[in-house]
Amino acid sequence: MFDQLEIVEQRYEQLNELLSDPDIVSDTDKLREYSKEQADLQETVEVYREYKEVKQQLEEALEMMGEASDADEQEMIKEEINTLKPQIPELEERMKLLLIPKDPMDDKNVVMEIRGAAGGDEANIFAGDLFRMYSRFSEEQGWKIEVMETNEADHGGFKEISFIIIGKGAYSKLKFENGAHRVQRIPTTESGGRIHTSTATVAVLPEVEDVEIEIRQEDLRIETYRSSGSGGQHVNTTDSAVRITHIPTGIVATSSEKSQIKNREKALKLLKTRVFDAKLQEEQAKYSEQRKSAVGTGDRSERIRTYNYPQNRVTDHRIGLTIQKLDQIVEGKLGEIIDALTIAEQTSKLEALNDGVL
């Protein structure tokens, strides 16, 4: 661990020098890249330096204790030792956590896709409830939501909806929502009062930037068509909706607002994100073969959570967490679940670091 910390500190010092170089300062891309890297390393370096200082103070105090002959002086040094000693394991634990490789996607915006799955109309209604839940959570975080694609269901909710959440750290908090969500409740149309079980799937994709993926124009098939609303009614009179297909992968994205130019931009952004995500999924699958994560496999068919309305209970199956606050959670109060999943992921990564897997 300490060898790694020395390397981190050396790199931090090197970045300080680079950021003072006039050639770097005049290069916007390099300046942004190095500034971000330095910011990412700063806390680790500060904690490591604090650790070295405390350790040195403790060693000096122990040495003074051996030389002190006066009882009052010994008592004073003993107090200092008792103050310094517990700080060592605390700082070591912090350093271990800071050495855990940060997910490079954590600071990104998020593209979320929710689909009604098993359960017919109830599944679509539940998909709408999940969209509302994430919208409320995003509002509380001060994030902005922009709807990309929708396919509204006839009896409420969505057959599918894709939207982007714009805000720093959105992916770090919402990445754990990836998977199948199950709901148990009595539908409003159910006269016999029987509990029905339905599911909706949630896909969480980090928004991709142009520099991260290159898509050739010749690999795209772009089509325009007339957008239709629920029940087949035409909502615009021109062929403004856009469908873009990435020919090598077969991945498709659509957008159906009134402006064809905006639709093309939105559909292309969504397509790039989906193509990038497909590559990311491949890489993550390789890692999960080496080690199963404490917060699930990340597979979108994996059942991750159950929402039991009659018992006001939400259970996250990946970490065995049960909370009797469903009424609050569906209103966007996701903090308790997200915090527990974050801790589980950190613990898992720390174990992997100790085992030499990371």
Curated annotation (Swiss-Prot):
Gene3D superfamilies: 3.30.160.20, 3.30.70.1660, 6.10.140.1950. PROSITE patterns: RF_PROK_I (PS00745). It is found in: Cytoplasm. One of its GO terms (cellular component) is cytoplasm. The keyword Lipid metabolism does not apply. One of its GO terms (molecular function) is translation release factor activity, codon specific. The keyword Cytoplasm applies. Peptide chain release factor 1 directs the termination of translation in response to the peptide chain termination codons UAG and UAA. Belongs to the prokaryotic/mitochondrial release factor family. NCBIfam families: prfA, PRK00591.1. This is Peptide chain release factor 1. It comes from Macrococcus caseolyticus (strain JCSC5402) (Macrococcoides caseolyticum). The gene is prfA.
